[in-house]
From Swiss-Prot:
Source species: Colwellia psychrerythraea (strain 34H / ATCC BAA-681)
EC number(s) on file: 2.1.1.45
Pfam families, alphabetized: Thymidylat_synt (PF00303)
Binding site for (6R)-5,10-methylene-5,6,7,8-tetrahydrofolate: D183, A282
The keyword Transferase is annotated on this UniProt entry: yes
Domain of life: Bacteria
Protein name: Thymidylate synthase
Family: Belongs to the thymidylate synthase family. Bacterial-type ThyA subfamily.
CDD domains: TS_Pyrimidine_HMase
Signal peptide interval: none
Compartments, as annotated in UniProt: Cytoplasm
């Protein structure tokens, strides 16, 4: 995927050095990156200039769709992405809102499916969007956001990719997703997969055609210890043709996504890639 490599090169050429207080590492940073994925043509943005994986990213987002708040439930789906944040985060371990082992608190999917109202009760943001789209309605506010500053203290992590805005033009569904920060060598492909899959699934369960997914990143960065591999290995490789994502056509409703869907319902066809690259991870 050339756009991915172009962003990496832009960060190297134009980035500003920033000291990250959380990680204690320096990173080259640019502000504002826009990526586009043609979901209608099934051009699945799985990085080909290094070996990449997709099922963990999909599993995590299915967990968000289900409103999970336990790392154990994410593990059952096939991803361990929440284990550390739920169980190894000192600030969260000492937080009185933590309910016990594997509890994540009010993050991501909880906000999307059960946003707390000031007067009591909750709002199911996702169901409202699905119901509207099935009826051909776009009220220009088909938005699901995980970003709730009033409850940051009640969760183990602030959302990174935080808001998803659907737009319906005729019978074609588009998606614009917003991300506040991105570790480009390691994290971006994970998020690319999620943006693509979210639009593909929403189009499928609402009976619409999938159109374009627009992925907007505010702070895109490469850590200093990732630069040698990026410059000397990944950027010297030619991207290969993008694969296709095959989603089980029997997935027809939000209830299906909430109940029986597993990672066996997602397959990739035609994926060819270069060898793996083991980038350092900033904890």
């Amino acid at each position: 995927m050339r756009a991915y490599l172009d962003l990496c090169q832009r960060i190297i050429d134009q980035g500003t050095w920033v000291e990250n207080e959380r990680t204690g590492k320096r990173c080259l940073t640019v502000i504002n990156a826009d990526l586009e994925y043609n979901v209608g043509n099934n051009e699945f943005p799985l990085i080909t200039t290094r070996k990449s994986f997709f099922k963990s990213a999909i599993a995590e987002f299915i967990g968000y769709i289900r409103g999970y708040d336990s790392a154990a439930d994410f593990r059952k789906l096939g991803t361990k992405t929440w284990d550390a944040n739920a169980n190894l985060n000192d600030a969260w371990l000492n937080n009185t809102h933590r309910k016990g082992e594997d509890d994540m608190g009010r993050v991501y999917g909880i906000q999307g499916r059960a946003w707390a109202k000031p007067d009591g009760g909750t709002i199911d943001q996702l169901k409202k969007i699905v119901d509207n789209l099935k009826d051909g309605i776009d009220d220009r506010a088909e938005i699901m956001t995980f970003y709730n500053p009033g409850e940051f203290h009640m969760g183990c992590l602030r959302p990174c990719m935080h808001t998803h805005n659907f737009s319906l033009l005729g019978d074609t569904l588009h998606l614009t997703s917003f991300q506040r920060s991105c570790d480009v060598p390691l994290g971006l492909n994970f998020n690319q997969v999620q943006v693509f899959v979210f639009l593909a699934l929403m189009a499928q369960i609402t009976g619409k055609k999938a159109g374009m997914a627009y992925h907007k990143i505010v702070n895109a960065h490469i850590y200093e210890d990732q630069l040698p591999l990026m410059k000397e290995v990944q950027l010297k490789r030619e991207p290969l043709a993008l694969p296709k994502l095959i989603i089980n056509p029997e997935i027809k409703s939000l209830e299906d996504l909430e109940t029986w869907v597993t990672m066996d319902d997602f397959k990739v066809e035609g994926y060819e890639c270069h060898e793996a690259i083991k980038y350092p991870f900033a904890v």
